[in-house]
Design a protein with these regions (language model features):
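Conserved ABC ATPase signature
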Residues: 147-151, 155
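Conserved ABC transporter NBD signature motif
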Residues: 68-79
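Catalytic Walker B motif of ABC-type/P-loop ATPase nucleotide-binding domains
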Residues: 172-175
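Helix-to-loop junction immediately C-terminal to a conserved catalytic motif
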Residues: 60
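Conserved ABC ATPase "signature" region
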Residues: 76, 124-143
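ABC ATPase NBD coupling module
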Residues: 23, 77-93, 124, 198, ...
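Conserved catalytic motifs of ABC-family nucleotide-binding domains
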Residues: 168
């Protein structure tokens, strides 16, 4: 089972040079040591610019560290080929901040494209069965012929989750996926992620929100200025940031959380 290990990982960015003024290197992450074991549900929290997104991109192999090493299943993420598809595609399901569904394609066509990227060319009936299965998992049966514009933002997020799950990856990487969702959509997304995690999938979710992190009480890795400043097995969003006297975002989610929260808390 794949374990994720970061060993003193640093990543720096060079901003575009201004016509006047000094040239400053931006810190993505700095000297991060972190181990995440298979089956964990981990929130990566912190202010905007704290390094959450950079950390996920490094784990996914979409960026290379300037210093240190990233290992997933004791391999460095990259373009290692295995059984006709890349090792990275086998390991990760990814959802980034912006919606990335192709608007001119139906939901079924979007998922069929993802299936082909992962598995290669297959018989149409095999692809159709797989699509129906993942849409059923996210509670969206019968939307194959609809276009993204016909769905709500919350439903589009669930389609993206179905797309991320189509290759049955052992690890899900999620970056601010509940931003701009209403309370009910956030709640539905949390239930789905909780169910996926209970089946053994590792879930790593970067967020700048607080309410549902505090409800779920899973492992919380706190970042500030590119560094990991806290790592609590069953923590709350502000535990470490308050001690560090750093500001943090408070997002109020409707009271449905307070009514039903015990159903998904361990």
């Amino acid at each position: 089972m794949p374990t994720i290990e970061l060993e003193r990982v640093s990543k720096f960015y060079k901003p575009k040079r201004r016509r006047k003024g000094p040239f400053h290197t931006l810190v993505g992450v700095e000297e991060v040591d972190l181990t995440i074991r298979q089956g964990e549900f981990v929130f990566v929290v912190g202010d905007s610019g704290s390094g959450k997104s950079a950390l996920l991109r490094l784990i996914a192999g979409e960026e290379r560290p300037d210093q240190g090493k990233v290992f997933v299943d004791r391999k460095e993420p990259g373009g290692i080929l295995r059984i006709g598809r890349s090792w990275t595609e086998m390991m990760f399901g990814k959802i980034w901040q912006e919606l990335t569904l192709i608007r001119k394609k139906t939901i079924g066509q979007n998922l069929a494209l993802a299936s082909r990227i992962v598995y290669g060319k297959e018989q149409p009936q095999v692809v159709d069965i797989r699509i129906k299965k993942v849409l059923g998992l996210v509670g969206l049966k019968g939307v194959e012929e609809k276009y993204p514009v016909e769905l709500s933002i919350g439903e589009c997020r669930r389609v993206e989750l179905a797309r991320a799950l189509i290759g049955s990856p052992p690890i899900l990487l999620l970056d601010e996926i509940t931003a701009n969702l209403d309370g009910d959509s956030v709640w539905d997304t949390l239930h789905l992620l909780n169910d996926v995690n209970l089946k053994g999938t590792t879930v790593i979710m970067a967020t700048g929100e607080s309410q549902y992190v505090n409800i779920l009480r899973r492992r919380v890795v706190t970042m500030s200025e590119g560094r990991v400043i806290g790592d609590v097995q069953k923590g709350k969003y502000g535990d470490v940031l308050e001690r560090e006297r750093k500001p943090f975002v408070i997002t109020r989610v409707p009271n449905r959380f307070d009514i039903e929260k015990t159903s998904i808390r361990n």
